[in-house]
Each structure stands twice: as C-alpha cells, then as structure tokens.
C-alpha cells in the first residue's frame, strides 16, 4: 500500500517562490534597502491562497505595481550621483542622435517625449520647439531632472515601506539627508572658489556675499521674527484679534501611525501632494473670508509630521474690513474659526478623530504675553535648530549619527522641504518684503526731499548697529496698513525688462532697479547696484538660478497660467560697502553676472542647427 505524501505548508511554498528566477527578475529593479520589507508585504498579500497559479500572480503583480509607482522607468535606483551624471550625458546624446532623423517639428517633439518617458521624467513644457530642444540636448537639464525624479521616487518608497517615522528615520530618510549634506558641501565649495569683482575693484567670493543675505540662517531667522513682531505690534495698536492655528491633513495622507505601524488607510500620497491639499483648502478658506469681509494677516509655517506628512502652523490676526456686513457679530475671530473648520473638515468628514485633530485653534490672550511667542519656536527650530524638536505627536526628535556624520533634526527638516519643494515660511497679508529689501538699497540723499510716506518707509527699513533697529510695523503703516491691497500700495517696485541670451536662448528678464511712490507719478528712486564680473571660474559648468517667485494660493476670477521664465544669464548681488554703517540684514543683491560665452546656446528655428552632432 502506497504511503501518502505530506503536502508542504502554504507559507513555505510562498517563501520558496521568492527564490525562483521568475520572482528574482521582477525584484531586480528594486533597491536593496526595500527588498526585505517589500517581500514581507508580498507574503501578506499571498497568504490567502495556497494554489501556485494564484499566489504567484499575486506576488508578481504586487511587485510590478510597486515598481511602476516608485521606480522610474529606465532608471537604476541604486546608482549614486556620479552614475546620474553619466546617465544624463547618455540621455542628452540619445536625444541629439534621435533629432538627426526627425522629419518635422512634430516628429522631433515625439522623439523627445518618448525619450523623456523612457527615463521617467516630464517633457519640457514650452510653446516653442526651440526651447524644448535646447533643454533636451543639454546634459545639465537632464541631470537636474534625474536628480529630482530619482530622489523623490526613492523617498516616496521609503515612506510607503515605513522607514520614515519617529522610531526609524524621522522627517526624511537617512539617504536623503546624506545626499542633501553632500549637495550643500558641493555648493559651498563652488561658491567659495568663485570670486567676483565689481566696478570699484572690490573682490568677494560668492560665499562671502551669500553670508550677507537670507541664505545665512541666522539672518533669515532674524528677519522672519522681525516681521512677525511687526505684525503683532500692528495688531495690538488696532485691537485686532489673534489666533494660533494648526491645520493637519486627513488620515489617508499619513503612511505611519504613532506607534510606527503602517496606516491601512494610507492612499500612497506623497508629502508634496499633501501640501498641495493644504494649499487648496487654505486658499478656499481665505477666499471665503474675503467674501465675508474678514481681513487676515500673519504667517504660516509648514512642518513635517514624524512620517513626513506636512502640517501647517499659522499665527493670524483678524479684523473686519469695509465689506463686513454682520456688524452685530463682534467676535470676528470666532466667525473666522468657524469658516476654517468648515474647510478643514470638508474631506472625509466622518472619519474618527477628524473634529479633534484636523484643526487646533488657540485664541491669543494679550494679557499672558507676546503672540510671537506662539510661533517663535517653530521659526527657530526649522531654520537652524535653536529650539528643541518635538513632533506634532509629542515625540522629541534628537540628533543621531550615520557613521561619523551627525544628522540634526533641523537638517532633516531642511532636507524634507528641499526634497519635496515645500515652501516652509509664507507671509499672509501686509506689504511685500521685496519692496522692504529694495528700500535698503536706496541712498539717503535720494529721499531727502521725498514725500513723507517715502521717507517714513525708507527710515523704517534702515538698521544701524547699536543705534537703531529696523521697524516692520512702521513700514506697514507707511504702506497703508497690514491688509492693504497690492493695487493700493503707496510704494511699489520699479522694474526693468530686457532680453538676455542665456544657456537656452533668449528670454525676458525683469529686474527691479528702484521704487515708485504714489505721491510722485513717474519718479523713480533708484537703488544702488554694482556690476559684478567673475575673476575666476570656481566650478566647471556651475549654474546660477534665479530665486523662485512669490506664490499666491488664493482663487481668482480670471485665472491665467503664468508664463514660464527661463534661467537668465545674469543674477543680482547687492551693494556691500564697508563704509556704510547700516547692515543690510540679508539684502546683498546687485547686478549683472553674465554666463560665459561657451555656455550660451543661441536657439535657431530649425532642428538641424540646434544639434551639433548631426
């Protein structure tokens, strides 16, 4: 009589399938760091079936779906920065060779789109084909796009698999922080090695000039606190009500729970998508408040939860405007809070804890101290780590070591913001800080006979060491108040438009050269600017990008898509005279810094002329 053969347990068969060539082929594109946790999650998916035709397809499809979302097509996620540079040169060469066979402009665009898709990046979005081709054949453009694409995909995978949380790697993964530190070191070496000379014969390195701007973290922190204190001064004078608001995302934006376990409701959204949700909700809220005649001004700060999901802290002051109709409701702040709750609870309103955690509001009691104290610690700890880092969940994030490299909490936050392109600090209401900085570049002789608002504003922005501090509140008064509309500003920027030749062809550059005062139509108070020329070439292929512009998240009646601005061949550096006693507190900008002629690319309408390889 034949004995019965004992059947192998299902879990053991699942584990043996991972050793087969079929599964190894699928997981070969996954970074080594992810494989163990990905296999564990694949086992959970396979657990309900013991038939090989089912559990094998489940495992393969799960890994394929994961790779499709977190591993860009045609990209090896394990490559380092040197490999990315080599890949960028290879991709640019492939585009140049492909364009040689292009039969028409449409055919050329299809070739570029196909190659961009193969490398998992977006095709350059420009109306003119020459602008698209100029970027697609430049290895530096490919390098920037690949760094961003690979970095964000790898970080999103770390969040999805539960590596980024308080008990593991808070705010950002260790690899992302180490990459950011390496990038900062490269930039610092390039800036220190590049020396500029102005028309007066004075020479400074770019690193020396950057130390005088808001790139210096202590200057940046000081300027932010100066502006916050100025808003508080205005609020106290006018009797405006103050509130401190913490706005968080719904639970499906969070990858990890407080205990470190995966959140089953997680929708695989990235921190950038979560921040876009907050931008949309607060924009709707601000528009609703404006329609009701409730004016708000203050600051908002974006911070990460322990699992990298953002939340916003906002110090806001509210007052009724001329459009406010319900004068019998004196508690304007209470009405504003109700509007905020309406939009904070709008998404997934019925989920447990929504009313408790989505929106936390504290009214500011002026008798208990300064309103700026509510937000000062968030400014300090997120710029240079002066304050202790505590997460929204109450955990304390301490400095840790990766090898011999110290990873501070503030460095993790900086990495998080840079990786996902999240703006950490934003002013709501008030006069623009750009005009404040431009006023500091104007000499006293220019305003001696100026109208009173101009003299008041100029005097408010000046700082003399040991004698006088700058006064943001007085600057707001001279401009018309804390909630003055942009079209009613007393002082505005004087801008100059000119066409420049950059790396990607001709573009229009808008540069401020002074300010206008509404009391003197047609008169420009010119600012002091220097012309800086490079004395030496500190880095091969170094690129200087224009700073990003202001962003307005509010809804508009006639939305217009902003025109894309290209990198210009010049950037501005401000006056830094040793004889001037006033410190600029970060306002060193000035003048035309041309890219070398070897880096200029004069675009032509035909494809053959754009590619040297043809």
Regions found by a protein language model. Give the residues of each.
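Right-hand nucleic-acid polymerase module
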Residues: 1-308, 320-614
